[in-house]
Amino acid sequence: VHWSAEEKQLITGLWGKVNVADCGAEALARLLIVYPWTQRFFSSFGNLSSPTAILGNPMVRAHGKKVLTSFGDAVKNLDNIKNTFAQLSELHCDKLHVDPENFRLLGDILIIVLAAHFAKEFTPDCQAAWQKLVRVVAHALARKYH
């Protein structure tokens, strides 16, 4: 994957302003609410019975932060995303058996969360760079499935 200097700047510039805990929690909560079938991968998280329960669930919040922290690893390693996510791909494929389509869904939700939090700064160019990033990350996470 080739990243232009502008794409790198748009990604790293916005990333520096992201509250990882809040945006991560919101992104994972939205995934579980909008795509309820994804909840089956989180049965150990306790009460996921309603949007209110999901939004208030501390395990959802903690895992959302963990997920978005790993996105930070992608931002730091734009030229080596495939290797950055090799172990996570193995874990999600071999041990957790997560449908790789869910990585794409979460990426799309992250775009929505970023747009909501950074409305003015999230220009079409910025969105395009981030859309490319979430696609590359989803592809890297799905790699062990092929």
Swiss-Prot record:
Domain Globin: 2-146
Gene3D superfamilies per the UniProt record, alphabetical: Globins
Disulfide bond entries: none
GO cellular component entries: blood microparticle; haptoglobin-hemoglobin complex; hemoglobin complex
Positions contributing to heme b binding: H63, H92
GO BP, sorted A to Z: hydrogen peroxide catabolic process
Expression (tissue specificity): Red blood cells.
Signal peptide bounds: none
GO molecular function terms attached to this record: haptoglobin binding; heme binding; metal ion binding; organic acid binding; oxygen binding; oxygen carrier activity; peroxidase activity
Membrane-crossing segments per the record: none
InterPro entries registered for this protein in UniProt: Globin, Globin-like_sf, Globin/Proto, Hemoglobin_b, Hemoglobin_oxygen_transport
Keyword Cytoplasm: no
Keyword terms: Heme, Iron, Metal-binding, Oxygen transport, Transport
Similarity comment text for this entry: Belongs to the globin family.
Subunit structure: Heterotetramer of two alpha chains and two beta chains.
Protein name in the entry: Hemoglobin subunit beta
Species the sequence originates in: Anser indicus
